[in-house]
Amino acid sequence: MRAVVQRVSHASVTVDGKVVGAIDEPGLLALVGVTHTDGPAEAAKLARKLWTLRILEDEKSCSDVGAPLLVVSQFTLYGDARKGRRPTWHAAAPGPVAEPLVDQVVEELRALGARVETGVFGARMSVALTNEGPFTVLLEV
């Protein structure tokens, strides 16, 4: 699994003109991608990493300060544009494999005590955010 994680002051995701998930205080936005070899162990590991990653103000984590997370699925994290002019998506897991794993990341975070908002899997989404720092990291588990 891959996640692009951004420290944000606020973020929201909109589908068909309606806000479906938002955080209105400092926290993390995680864009999450799934590949064919990922399973429940990777989803649990990513959730723990997101919850304890010390990239908030004063080197704190979401678990330290109770900061919220906005988790948005993004299969394009496994796009490959090394050849030609058009990316391929062969490394991205298909929806029936990826969706339950993204859901598991969210469920694991909530079980750890996190406040989590989400996008809508497979939907065309608009993501708005204010990146603090800016601070963006790539996680791979």
From Swiss-Prot:
Entry protein name: D-aminoacyl-tRNA deacylase
Gene name of this polypeptide: dtd
GO MF assignments: D-tyrosyl-tRNA(Tyr) deacylase activity; Gly-tRNA(Ala) deacylase activity; Ser(Gly)-tRNA(Ala) hydrolase activity; tRNA binding
Enzyme class of the recorded protein, top EC level: hydrolase
Family statement: Belongs to the DTD family.
InterPro entries reported in the protein's UniProt record: Daa-tRNA_deacyls_DTD, DTD-like_sf
Reactions that this protein is recorded to catalyse: glycyl-tRNA(Ala) + H2O = tRNA(Ala) + glycine + H(+); a D-aminoacyl-tRNA + H2O = a tRNA + a D-alpha-amino acid + H(+)
PANTHER family hit by this protein: D-AMINOACYL-TRNA DEACYLASE 1 (PTHR10472:SF5), D-TYROSYL-TRNA TYR DEACYLASE (PTHR10472)
The protein's Enzyme Commission number: 3.1.1.96
UniProtKB keywords: Cytoplasm, Hydrolase, RNA-binding, tRNA-binding
